[in-house]
């Protein structure tokens, strides 16, 4: 989701991590690379490593964190201690397979008190989240859809669109809402695969491009190839900051959380758990991270340390979050093959 390139193992070194040269513990984090690592280092790890006399290092696996954790389990050689910004579908899938460590009852309760129950799962908490939102080019459209039902209404809005060609659970959540499911029910209602694919089939003739990355979203909207589409919220606001005239509609969008979690069987699970507790309890540090990356952080107090211009663009801002539909990740963890296959067939058909 962050568009980082390549899979590169990066040890940031003792000095960079801010730990003592006498450190004997190395905390290994499966990350995304690029600006995500840089922000995590600056906002969290410099202080955390120094206070706990350890060294943190990243192994970057953008978009393939799930595969890496599965491979480590298959080989019975767990190399990572924690994962940074693991996408929701992958996180719930790994947890369902017993490959992410469950939170203790007391830790979960503490996180819920600090962050709010909606941000906390049995295995961690959301971090680096965004929204899959309706975006239209106001230079090319006088009136924009204001709900997902309108976005799917091709008679009212016949313009060509772009839509996600990846992340099926996010895509079908927009279809559920367009078909009339309240956004408060998407997280707990089992997905009717045939019904959502039928809804998507009605939209497909008006989809000109199925995007595969954030960079492609921006390229298509910047070029004017389509005036309307579903975009990642952070990518849309980046275009606006560059002068592209876009309207962002949060209403009925799909919430796309990522998660911090501890890998089950990690060699340094205690230190990894301590890192999660550090992040959750340091809203100012979260604000630093969000200001660098422009993606959301879980502690609501972090908004106090952000310019309003940035805070208003984050998915976890209460004004935005209450307008988003959360996918049923628990269902997806048990039915990912079924949905992924159905979505691939939809794209090819």
Stretches found by the model and what they are:
Residues 13-16:
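C-terminal motif of bacterial Sec signal peptides marking the signal peptidase cleavage site
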Residues 18-20:
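Bacterial signal peptide processing site
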Residues 130, 194-203, 240-266:
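Periplasmic-binding protein-like
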Residues 32-41, 78-225:
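Extracytoplasmic ligand-binding site segments that recognize negatively charged/polar headgroups
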Residues 133-140, 176-180, 257-271, 288-291:
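A bilobed periplasmic-binding-protein/Venus flytrap-type ligand-binding module shared by bacterial periplasmic
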Residues 263-323:
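Mature extracytoplasmic/periplasmic domains
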Residues 89-93, 222, 228-245:
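A ligand-binding cleft/hinge motif common to bilobed small-molecule-binding domains
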Residues 23-92:
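Early extracytoplasmic/lumenal segment of secretory-pathway proteins
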């Amino acid at each position: 989701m962050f568009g980082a390139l390549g899979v590169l193992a990066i040890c940031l070194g003792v000095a960079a991590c801010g730990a003592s040269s006498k450190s004997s513990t190395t905390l290994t984090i499966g990350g995304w690379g690029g600006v995500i690592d840089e922000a995590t280092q600056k906002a969290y790890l410099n202080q955390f490593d120094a206070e706990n006399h350890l060294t943190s290092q990243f192994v970057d696996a953008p978009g393939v964190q799930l595969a890496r954790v599965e491979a480590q389990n298959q080989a019975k050689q767990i190399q990572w201690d924690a994962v940074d910004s693991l996408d929701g579908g992958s996180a719930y899938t790994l947890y369902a397979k017993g490959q992410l460590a469950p939170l203790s009852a007391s830790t979960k309760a503490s996180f819920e008190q600090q962050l709010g129950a909606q941000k906390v799962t049995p295995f961690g908490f959301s971090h680096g989240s965004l929204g899959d939102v309706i975006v239209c080019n106001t230079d090319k459209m006088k009136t924009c859809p204001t709900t997902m039902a309108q976005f799917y209404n091709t008679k009212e809005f016949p313009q060509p669109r772009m839509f996600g060609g990846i992340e099926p659970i996010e895509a079908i959540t927009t279809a559920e809402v367009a078909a009339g499911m309240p956004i408060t029910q998407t997280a707990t209602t089992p997905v009717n695969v045939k019904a959502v694919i039928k809804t998507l089939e009605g939209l497909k003739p008006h989809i000109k491009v199925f995007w595969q990355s954030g960079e492609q979203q921006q390229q298509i909207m910047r070029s004017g190839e389509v005036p309307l589409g579903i975009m990642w919220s952070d990518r849309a606001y980046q275009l606006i900051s560059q002068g592209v005239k876009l309207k962002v509609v949060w209403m009925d969008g799909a919430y796309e959380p990522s998660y911090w979690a501890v890998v089950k069987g990690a060699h340094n699970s205690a230190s990894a758990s301590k890192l999660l507790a550090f992040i959750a309890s340091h809203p100012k540090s979260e604000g630093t991270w969000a200001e660098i990356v422009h993606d959301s952080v879980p502690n609501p107090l972090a908004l106090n340390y952000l310019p309003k211009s940035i805070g208003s663009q984050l998915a976890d801002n209460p004004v935005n979050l209450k307008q988003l539909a959360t996918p049923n990740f628990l269902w997806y963890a048990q039915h990912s093959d079924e949905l992924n296959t159905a979505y691939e067939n939809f794209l090819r058909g």
